[in-house]
Amino acid sequence: MSSLVIPAGAQGPWPAPAKLNLFLHITGRRDDGYHTLQTVFQFLDHADQLYFSLRSDNAIHRFGGPPGVPVEKDLCVRAARLLQEAAGIEKGVDIYNEKRLPVGGGLGGGSSDAATTLWVLNRLWGTGLEPAQLADLGLRLGADVPVFLFGRAAWAEGVGELLTPVDPPQPWYVVINPEVSVSTAAVCSDPELTRDSPRMTIRDFPSSDGHNDCEAVVRRRHPAVAAALDWLNRSSPARLTGTGACVFAAFASQAQAQAIGRRVPAGWTGFVARGLNRSPLHEMADRDRAGITRASH
């Protein structure tokens, strides 16, 4: 937990949930260098917690957030400035981020922070953008941002922005972070990365033997990730999410997952979370339909 001090009257907390890639197939490469893919995204009930405090000027300030990330590169700040620009407004905000998701873990933490910022500020600032417009803005920040705005577990194609809702099982997961940094750019440029997986249809999921095409490369480049996969595989089939470094496995009950979670070896961190087919952000927005007037104090 963060020691971040949230001021009285700040709006929140608003969740920025983690996601898992239940499988990840790379099906090609576009002329601009981006890979085309097929995947299924599912959310977790484990999230960063964001608070927003409106300002009387147009400044955007960040408090907390991912350690070591400069303010100008923080996706919350970039999302807020992008919304300012798109809506042509002169409103400001202080953003407080109680960061719980690891940076660069393959859980989409930065993208989720950006999506929650766009979603909440669209309401707080009264900009009135439609969901499709927010998704277009989100895609400019990262390929994973649209699914967090979409708010449903989804079959994804393109670079991850073409989304169709799906309803996979919602098991309990053990998620392990082997505490190494995996460079997505390095994985995606690795000459041994599979880039021609056969295309599936949505009806092939979940009966197909899906896998993560990045896993072999990440295993080779990062022995700690390979060790985490091997350790978790002893209890339940384990997979990499995104390009890692986090790995996960599904369990039928919370008790089973917690029993494994308590045995995570020293030097790694882990948590137990429930898979969700609807984003906690959207669930909260539905409960708050009367207006975004929730204050933390």
Write out the residue ranges for each language-model feature.
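A broadly conserved amphipathic alpha-helix scaffold signal in soluble, globular proteins
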Residues: 81, 116-122, 136-139, 146
